[in-house]
């Protein structure tokens, strides 16, 4: 990060840091993500989200009433022109324990996936397997991923549009192989705050030229839609995320979640009866949004949306 920031930038950085720490700390507490004696493997991709996650977790650890370890892990997938020196230099300067895992998944993906097809599915499966193995080797008790609130919302929309499910990314889960606990400490954090924070911190961002840059991904299209909503209808994403934490099974249609067959007059009114829409507005904490972060997002993200449409 530059040694010299303007007073306005310093103020914005302080506000963003406070907001991100608060959101991350709240998510950790709500889901009991980190416990006494944990060894947390922080998956560092080189993107803005994982840099921010590592930064905030280190700060929270310094002030936490419990003791836990942090080790940063990066998977070098041998993509062409991958700058191998950046992360080791950054982590050494930061003074954090780390491990670089070298696995040529790039060649496997290129060999198996036809040209023009999205590579994310195979790439993510290979990456998960390697990270699970590494966590076991390191004795990690938790695996921390850098997905944020907007990722959770995009996944919810993707599953609704293309999977026929009301399903998102959980903030905490057991890994596919049943051997690890995976956590998402940034689950409550807004992407636009992370983006503004990373810009001010001047992290050495490493772009993903394997999957993240593919413009035809359904996920990217869905995120663009959500970003457009956020610009046109401020507060909509906050309301959507609140809905994910305020599920009413009796007013959905999943018989596995609610026993509709047993309902009769003696059951009484359940969760408001036949009110299909509760008109009481959701209150948002918009005062936590910093002016510089909002201005940066509106100027840059609106341009991206316009270009895509």
From Swiss-Prot:
Binds 1 [4Fe-4S] cluster per subunit. The cluster is chelated by three Cys residues, the fourth Fe has a free coordination site that may bind a sulfur atom transferred from the persulfide of IscS. [4Fe-4S] cluster binds at residues 120, 123, 211. The keyword 4Fe-4S applies. Its cofactor is Mg(2+); [4Fe-4S] cluster. CDD domains: TtcA-like. Pathway: tRNA modification. Its EC number is 2.8.1.-. GO terms for molecular function: 4 iron, 4 sulfur cluster binding; ATP binding; magnesium ion binding; sulfurtransferase activity; tRNA binding. Pfam families: ATP_bind_3. GO terms for cellular component: cytoplasm. It is found in: Cytoplasm. InterPro entries: Rossmann-like_a/b/a_fold, TilS/TtcA_N, tRNA_Cyd_32_2_STrfase, tRNA_thiolation_TtcA_Ctu1. It catalyses: cytidine(32) in tRNA + S-sulfanyl-L-cysteinyl-[cysteine desulfurase] + AH2 + ATP = 2-thiocytidine(32) in tRNA + L-cysteinyl-[cysteine desulfurase] + A + AMP + diphosphate + H(+). NCBIfam families: PRK10696.1. Belongs to the TtcA family. Homodimer. The thiolation reaction likely consists of two steps: a first activation step by ATP to form an adenylated intermediate of the target base of tRNA, and a second nucleophilic substitution step of the sulfur (S) atom supplied by the hydrosulfide attached to the Fe-S cluster. This is tRNA-cytidine(32) 2-sulfurtransferase. It comes from Psychromonas ingrahamii (strain DSM 17664 / CCUG 51855 / 37). The gene is ttcA.
């Amino acid at each position: 990060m530059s040694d010299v920031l303007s007073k306005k930038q310093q103020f914005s950085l302080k506000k963003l840091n406070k907001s991100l720490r608060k959101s991350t700390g709240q998510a950790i507490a709500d889901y009991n993500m980190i416990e006494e004696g944990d060894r947390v493997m922080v998956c560092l991709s080189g993107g803005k989200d994982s840099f921010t996650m590592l930064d905030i977790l280190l700060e929270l650890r310094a002030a936490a009433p419990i003791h836990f370890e942090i080790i940063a892990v990066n998977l070098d997938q041998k993509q062409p022109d991958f700058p191998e020196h950046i992360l080791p230099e950054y982590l050494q300067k930061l003074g954090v324990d780390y491990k670089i895992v070298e696995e040529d998944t790039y060649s496997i993906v290129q060999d198996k996936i036809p040209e023009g097809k999205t590579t994310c599915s195979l790439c993510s499966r290979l990456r998960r397997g390697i990270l699970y193995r590494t966590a076991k080797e390191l004795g990690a008790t938790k695996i921390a991923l850098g997905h944020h609130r907007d990722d959770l919302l995009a996944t919810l929309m993707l599953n609704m549009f293309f999977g026929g499910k009301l399903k998102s990314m959980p903030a905490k889960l057991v890994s596919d192989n049943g051997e690890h606990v995976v956590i998402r400490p940034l689950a409550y954090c807004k992407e636009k705050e992370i983006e503004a924070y990373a810009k001010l911190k001047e992290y050495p961002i490493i772009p993903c030229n394997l999957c993240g840059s593919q413009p035809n991904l359904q996920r990217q299209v869905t995120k663009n839609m959500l970003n457009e909503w956020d610009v046109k209808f401020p507060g909509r994403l906050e309301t959507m995320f609140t809905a994910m934490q305020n599920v009413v099974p009796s007013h959905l249609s999943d018989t596995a979640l609610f026993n509709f067959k047993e309902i009769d007059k003696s059951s009484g009114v359940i969760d408001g009866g036949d009110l299909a829409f509760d008109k009481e507005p959701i209150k948002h904490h918009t005062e936590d949004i910093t002016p510089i972060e909002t201005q940066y997002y509106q100027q840059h993200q609106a341009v991206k949306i316009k270009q895509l449409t």
